[in-house]
UniProtKB/Swiss-Prot annotation:
Disulfide-bond pairs as recorded: none
Gene: proB
Sequence ranges assigned to domain PUA in this UniProt record: 285-363
GO BP: any one term: L-proline biosynthetic process
Catalytic activity: L-glutamate + ATP = L-glutamyl 5-phosphate + ADP
Binding sites annotated in the UniProt record for substrate: 59, 146, 158
Matching CDD domains: AAK_G5K_ProB, PUA_G5K
UniProt-annotated location(s): Cytoplasm
The protein, known as: Glutamate 5-kinase
Keyword terms, alphabetized: Amino-acid biosynthesis, ATP-binding, Cytoplasm, Kinase, Nucleotide-binding, Proline biosynthesis, Transferase
Top EC category: transferase
């Protein structure tokens, strides 16, 4: 199945861990980053296949900071970790920028925390920014903003962040590159009977029992965090591959359909997963009523909702809240994430996007609800 899932994937989140990026803490591994950059460029440019959108989630800031500060052991004091992250992020971003630029690609540094993705407005802002970067052909390089968080450094990991980014942009696949070849039924270093797991369902509860253990002194994630990340990614319909990051041409071979590493398959299609997520996790905050033309475009063509088609706004809501879209008879057509708060939406009713700046003092998205953030009701 890996052949079809990765071969058909058009939007891919790639996560690399500290032990790979830093060669077990001995500074950034320039050779490895050069190789990943070359492969990412081939994917983005469509060399030998379709063009793909790629997001890199990269650890390594703390490890690089430790090297620059002359520390051989990872400190336990939280503010020293934050200082190391601040120092190391400079080198990490510069390395990716240099290597991607050598391949003719632009890059963008994006620092996120779990809180950014838990807040609806910041979630929507982050999503819009990342999708714009992808549209421009830029490779976002994402890391956790370790300098301003605490729990994420102590207990978190970039495997989880990679999964959350896959959720955020509705990626087709998450590729976790690690220093292991994939998942085994037991630790192969201790159990000679351990068998390699080529494929499993991402939600299989037996996987966590197989993946016990902890991370290295450089990074914090072990195989268990990758299993949990795969389950999270599957929540938005993304399947996950866990593979050895130093496998030659690993990204190119995966996207050509070669079976490398462990494939953890999402059991729910992307559109259905998105609908279920909105139904289960987001509370309805308000509603807008639309005219006949807008209702038809939503129902029949799955178009975005433009303010010019809105005739009324109900309730008080903020940007990023879930609102219902109703026709003139009050029947619910769809639900989606609002790009504008209720007060702004009332000003924009029946107005073309060319008037937004005059009415609001700024001009952002032309849509009230973008089609990517909209789910039709009733199936």
């Amino acid at each position: 199945m890996v052949s079809s899932i990765l071969r058909d994937a058009r939007r891919i989140v790639i996560k690399v861990g500290s032990s790979l990026v830093t060669n077990e803490g001995r500074g950034l591994d320039e050779t490895a980053i050069t190789e990943w950059s070359r492969q990412m460029a081939a994917l983005v440019n469509g060399s030998g296949g379709p063009r793909r959108e790629v997001i890199m989630v990269s650890s390594g800031a703390i490890a690089e900071g430790m090297k620059r500060l002359g520390w051989s052991a990872r400190p336990s004091e939280i503010h020293e970790l934050q200082a190391a992250a601040a120092v190391g992020q400079m080198g990490l971003a510069q390395m990716y920028e240099t290597k991607l630029r050598e391949q003719g690609l632009g890059s963008a540094q994006v620092l996120l925390t779990h809180a950014d993705l838990a807040d609806r407005e910041r979630y929507l802002n982050a999503r819009s920014t990342l999708l714009t970067l992808l549209r421009l052909g830029v490779v976002p390089v994402i890391n956790e903003n370790d300098t301003v968080v605490t729990d994420e450094i102590k207990f978190g990991d970039n495997d989880t962040l990679g999964a959350l980014v896959a959720n955020l942009v509705e990626a087709d696949a998450l590729v976790i590159l690690t220093d292991q070849k994939g998942l085994y039924t037991a630790d192969p270093r201790r159990d000679p009977h351990a068998q390699f797991v080529h494929e499993a369902a991402a939600g299989d509860p037996s996987l966590e029992a197989m993946a016990g253990g902890v991370g290295t002194s450089i990074g914090r994630g072990g195989m268990i965090t990758k299993i949990i990340a795969a389950r999270r990614a599957a929540g938005s319909g993304a399947s996950t591959v866990i593979a050895w990051g130093r496998e030659p041409d690993v990204l190119l071979r995966l996207t050509q359909g070669e079976a490398i590493g462990t494939l953890l398959v999402a059991q729910t299609a992307k559109k259905q997963a998105r609908k279920q997520w909105m139904a289960d996790h987001l509370q309805l905050r308000g509603a807008v009523t639309v005219d006949v033309g807008a209702a038809a475009k939503l129902r029949q063509e799955g178009k975005s909702l433009l303010p010019i088609g809105m005739v009324a706004v109900e309730g008080e809501f903020s940007r990023g809240d879930v609102i219902a879209v109703r026709d003139a008879a009050g029947a619910e057509i769809a639900r989606g994430l609002a790009n504008y708060a209720s007060a702004e939406a009332r000003l924009l009713c029946r107005r073309p996007s060319s008037e937004f700046e005059r009415l609001l003092g700024y001009s952002a998205e032309p849509e009230m609800v973008h089609r990517d953030n909209l789910v039709l009701s009733g199936g």
